């Protein structure tokens, strides 16, 4: 468990600030298995989780859906045979907010 998993997401409005470069450097250290991707100029967090079969991948996807609904923050999810790709970013600000790091940490916690 890290400090992020005990935090709650806050409502993110279009005028909410994106994480600064310094915040990004600090927060990414707390979720070392995640990478930063830039798509269409939008910074996103992404991780691929591996599973033994599709049923386990789907079970993880469903657990993630429940966690996302509970926090009111939703990822991009690609579920395939043996793997799930999860992408977090804040749509309203077209970039990364602290909520994305909180949810990345909570996503990792679902494996426990």
UniProtKB/Swiss-Prot annotation:
GO terms, biological process: tetrahydrobiopterin biosynthetic process
Stretch forming the signal peptide: none
Gene3D superfamilies, per the entry: Transcriptional coactivator/pterin dehydratase
A GO MF label: 4-alpha-hydroxytetrahydrobiopterin dehydratase activity
Reactions performed catalytically: (4aS,6R)-4a-hydroxy-L-erythro-5,6,7,8-tetrahydrobiopterin = (6R)-L-erythro-6,7-dihydrobiopterin + H2O
Transmembrane regions: none
EC supergroup of this enzyme: lyase
One Pfam family here: Pterin_4a
KW 4Fe-4S (keyword) present: no
InterPro entries (UniProt xref): PCD_sf, Pterin-4-alpha-carb_dehyd, Pterin_deHydtase
Key words of the record: Lyase
Catalytic activity, EC: 4.2.1.96
Similarity comment text for this entry: Belongs to the pterin-4-alpha-carbinolamine dehydratase family.
Listed name of the protein: Putative pterin-4-alpha-carbinolamine dehydratase
Source taxonomy: Bacteria, Pseudomonadati, Pseudomonadota, Gammaproteobacteria, Alteromonadales
